[in-house]
């Protein structure tokens, strides 16, 4: 596992603060080409009044969103609907995944007030469904599991009718962490596999594919009422047969919901896009996934874990009842 230490001077007691690079571990990597995106991936720039209001509430509560940190292409659409995915435990991740635009380094201490701030923002936005994710916190004994649980509890207390979806890290080598999170009773537990196992060393070197599959399986064993969800990116050099095997692995873990989206390269220092997968291939993946038994599938070039999450959750409940 790669954990990056921040050795620059970020001491708030000094008058000058050294601005550290966002991805220090990638600084010496050779540049990779960034191809122009095809027409089916381009989106409108954000800027509506509702978008501005969402931004104001996020800023007032001093919160971090994965929408901004991960450079999500859907931020204009989602924030215009007052939908935001909150990223707890800071803006700095202890992992160094080759696809991700979130800052890498040694994070600061947890903000004990953050669960309440997230709950306040959820109430102000009037969310019927909220998605909460986090950076990886390998530096914490429980990987941040108790902080997840506290955030869920705070949202429940302030907005009891709001359904809660969490997108968790893998809690690798964090005994009891998953049990803590599941005991907090989120409605949906999402953990993304991100890519097929043959690409893990290059794309997700700090993670273990079958550990992630087992985490999803264990979550359902701990509480069968929870909906489980996972997502992957395509365009990283995977074969179709590998994606189909991944679907089988997730179904063997009784995962309910699969998302598949196009990988988009954040910078020249990140993993290159090996291929822009056309929309008809996403449609084929969706049909195959439904045939394999998933309750819900979202497979489009712009699909992301929390995109249309509220609408998808309502469909999930209806399909389980059917």
From Swiss-Prot:
Binding site for [4Fe-4S] cluster 1: 67, 72, 78, 306
GO cellular component annotations of the record: cytoplasm
Domain Radical SAM core intervals: 79-295
Protein name per its UniProtKB record: Lipoyl synthase 2
UniProtKB keywords: 4Fe-4S, Cytoplasm, Iron, Iron-sulfur, Metal-binding, S-adenosyl-L-methionine, Transferase
Pathway assigned in UniProt: Protein modification; protein lipoylation via endogenous pathway; protein N(6)-(lipoyl)lysine from octanoyl-[acyl-carrier-protein]: step 2/2
Subcellular compartments: Cytoplasm
Biased composition (Basic and acidic residues): 14-34
One Pfam family per UniProt: Radical_SAM
Annotated binding of [4Fe-4S] cluster 2, by residue: 93, 97, 100
Enzyme Commission no: 2.8.1.8
Biological source species: Bradyrhizobium diazoefficiens (strain JCM 10833 / BCRC 13528 / IAM 13628 / NBRC 14792 / USDA 110)
Cofactor needs: [4Fe-4S] cluster
Similarity remark: Belongs to the radical SAM superfamily. Lipoyl synthase family.
